[in-house]
Amino acid sequence: MDCHLSILILFGCCVLSCSRELSPQPSNEVNLLDSKTIQGELGWISYPSHGWEEISGVDEHYTPIRTYQVCNVMDHSQNNWLRTNWVPRNSAQKIYVELKFTLRDCNSIPLVLGTCKETFNLYYMESDDDHGVKFLEHQFTKIDTIAADESFTQMDLGDRILKLNTEIREVGPVNKKGFYLAFQDVGACVALVSVRVYFKKCPFTVKNLAMFPDTVPMDSQSLVEVRGSCVNNSKEEDPPRMYCSTEGEWLVPIGKCTCNAGYEERGFICQACRPGFYKALDGVAKCTKCPPHSSTQEDGSMNCRCENNYFRAEKDPPSMACTRPPSAPRNVISNINETSVILDWSWPLDTGGRKDITFNIICKKCGWNVRQCEPCSPNVRFLPRQLGLTNTTVTVTDLLAHTNYTFEIDAINGVSELSSPPRQFAAVSITTNQAAPSPVMTIKKDRTSRNSISLSWQEPEHPNGIILDYEVKYYEKQEQETSYTILRARGTNVTISSLKPDTTYVFQIRARTAAGYGTNSRKFEFENSPDSFSISGENSHVVMIAISAAVAIIVLTVVTYVLVGRFCGYHKSKHSSDEKRLHFGNGHLRLPGLRTYVDPHTYEDPTQAVHEFAKELDATNIAIDKVVGAGEFGEVCSGRLKLPSKKEISVAIKTLKVGYTEKQRRDFLGEASIMGQFDHPNIIRLEGVVTKSKPVMIVTEYMENGSLDSFLRKHDAQFTVIQLVGMLRGIASGMKYLSDMGYVHRDLAARNILINSNLVCKVSDFGLSRVLEDDPEAAYTTRGGKIPVRWTSPEATAYRKFTSASDVWSYGIVLWEVMSYGERPYWEMSNQDVIKAVDEGYRLPLPMDCPAALYQLMLDCWQKDRNNRPKFEQIVSILDKLIRNPGSLKIITSAAARPSNLLLDQSNVDIATFHTTGDWLNGMRTAHCKEIFTGVEYSSCDTIAKISTDDMKKVGVTVVGPQKKIISSIKALETQSKNGPVPV
């Protein structure tokens, strides 16, 4: 007992110092039993009674606690049991037992080596109810044997320091309503400082705005999936889930909730947006301040209300400022050309805060009293359109001549229809010029005699101005207009005398205004005898029937004669009966099965040629979207063509400008007549023409990438050599087709090649194949015409000798343009210098990185003797071989192997000729690189001469094109220093 007392006293002193190091209990542990928290005696069952003893002590807060100890180390065969009271399981599936104890080292106790132990045993028993003091050892199941990590000795007793051990054991699963714990001593000197029994749970938490309740793990083998619920004012974006582990930890968060519109995430809640702020959509976004000209007055707003006279269009996002309609357009200017007018105006001063401004044109036809106006005829045309204009100009055509019009130009934006104020428009009134009148429709015979006839007629339906007089043209029918007489009449009647008796005369009448004569009326025939009648008019159908019957009789007679002759066996030739016959029409001999180009200029009437080779389109099937440029004859527009039962396609539309001359009309229709004869994938395709309404239009397929030269300059050094050769092959194939048809283009250049989105090149611009008067690339020759000398062969420049061989020369220039990515041939040399240099045998230099085979093809195309140039058929064959053998395109001509008769390549600029880096870069058209080189170590010409491709990348020259030009120029400098300058 003395030993017991010493242990108790020392334990009471020691627990204080050891307990202060304890950490707080984790939040995921739920205590079922904690001996330290029990007030008063624990009341556990000790068996036998002289075994475990309950003693008192204090914790680190000097709070009394009850503990048990045993130290019967002197006696053999100890079997001392200590059982706790019945502990309810609650919701636990697995429990943990935490023991805090001290244990004495047996070696520190004399004379106990055979009886002292340094372990004790832990047991448990499940039950559905409390058994009271009843205790049966065999009902308990052993959990584990507990050993101390540290034991105390006699020296520790002297220092009054005891070493506290903590052991935790896991028990489970437990299924009954409660359980007991038991401690078996078999001869140790041990003190149970505290016993804590607990289970683990995943505590309530909020994750991704989802609440997860307290969750107890089910067993030790699997995770428990828990479905979360969204916090207030939020909704599921993805179903929120987490997994509760056996250690009471939440794992693997999946899904989330997001705050509703009008609320934002603040910590673990969704908080309403305060006044002046809004949130339009559910999600993670924060509340945003109301945009200009809008506000909110309450919490939780999903959008902001616009101020008075400000609006938000249906498709405007809530983040967009409220806007208002624009003010009226300004500075309207009209430019009248006969029966058309071009209207120009300035943008409104106030756009209302929007960019989607469009303009509508309201057309009114007014009498001479301006207040009496009515809507314009639907025949009036607006180019590009009447409504929804995005540019500040429109062309109005097909107006009536000598008529008052008022045009109101509305400025409209996306909120105009929401506003109540009146329309915002600017108005301009015009009077169209007088024009030639429409034809006289009917001529009436009033009276006649043997030598005279009196005629009358009505004023033209559309006088288009003030009628000044009428021109009466007449001739004897039998003369067939070889000899005719013209007289003028002031009014709508005339008496013609001095006629031959009993003779039929043909009459035509046309009216004249200040703008000129109108079209002649149709022909009317009258006989100057008292019984004559009009062949045109009511009796015309009788005459036509009689003529038709006579023709039929003649044809029948001829056919019968031929058949009888054949039946009788008479032959005028020995040719077989199935001999192909040749047909003559329009002055051209046509061979069956052979397609040959027909020059439309040989037709007397260009309309006849265009109708023979081109399809007439209905203007209502064409929609013009926008004007994209101006051509030789008028504007060039993009638009859409929708033919019945066919898919809508994009097209390019050329219009004939208002006030055209007859020559311009012939040339315009001539271009369509030329294109209409071609059918090849590398020739621009003609969709049709519009000639029966104004404006006259040529409609072709639409090429998205525009002209080849501009396209290549825009995409400098961005294509492989194979891609470039593919483009060149397409051009050569199209030119072979033209050459086979006997057509000479005369103006083959990269600017006249169009390229579509699939990089297919097509030859175009046939309107300049005859006349090039307006071409900026043209130069005067000795014959007085204009030709594009930079692309034209020497014989064509000197003698106007255009052939397929001269087109081959031009193709060589196009080849050079393609390989140099749209460089201007001969750069800034004057046209006269170009002619002189070519005549002296100089040729364009090798483009940078150009394969040797392609440059040789260029030189072949530039043979001075046209008979030595390749045919287009040969060019196509050469390019096909190169495409099939791409390795041959990797051979680059060295500087030493180049011909000596080359012009100086201006892409390789001599650094020595410039004083500054900027001058040198300007010379290579890489001035945009000047800022990059300014201030770096390569700011002088001497240092730049040593630069490499990697160095250029470091300073910011990352585009391949400028890199190649600079490196090529440096290499040229090295070559010139070794071999001398290249001749010019």
UniProtKB/Swiss-Prot annotation:
**Glycan attachment points:** 232, 337, 391, 404, 493
Start and end of every Protein kinase domain?
A: 622-883
Q: Where is the signal peptide?
A: 1-20
Upper taxonomic classification of the species?
Eukaryota, Metazoa, Chordata, Craniata, Vertebrata
Residue numbers binding ATP: 629-634, 654, 701-707, 751-752
Q: Which reaction does it catalyse?
A: L-tyrosyl-[protein] + ATP = O-phospho-L-tyrosyl-[protein] + ADP + H(+)
- Per the record, ranges on the Cytoplasmic side are 566-984
Q: How does it assemble?
A: Heterotetramer upon binding of the ligand. The heterotetramer is composed of an ephrin dimer and a receptor dimer. Oligomerization is probably required to induce biological responses. Forms a ternary EFNA5-EPHA3-ADAM10 complex mediating EFNA5 extracellular domain shedding by ADAM10 which regulates the EFNA5-EPHA3 complex internalization and function. Interacts (phosphorylated) with PTPN1; dephosphorylates EPHA3 and may regulate its trafficking and function. Interacts (phosphorylated) with CRK; mediates EFNA5-EPHA3 signaling through RHOA GTPase activation.
Transmembrane stretches in the record are: 542-565
The record's annotation in SUPFAM superfamilies points to:
Fibronectin type III, Galactose-binding domain-like, Growth factor receptor domain, Protein kinase-like (PK-like), SAM/Pointed domain
Which family does the record assign? Belongs to the protein kinase superfamily. Tyr protein kinase family. Ephrin receptor subfamily.
Designated name of the protein: Ephrin type-A receptor 3
UniProt-listed GO biological process terms: axon guidance; cell migration; cellular response to follicle-stimulating hormone stimulus; cellular response to interleukin-1; cellular response to retinoic acid; endocardial cushion development; ephrin receptor signaling pathway; fasciculation of motor neuron axon
Q: Which organism is it from?
A: Rattus norvegicus
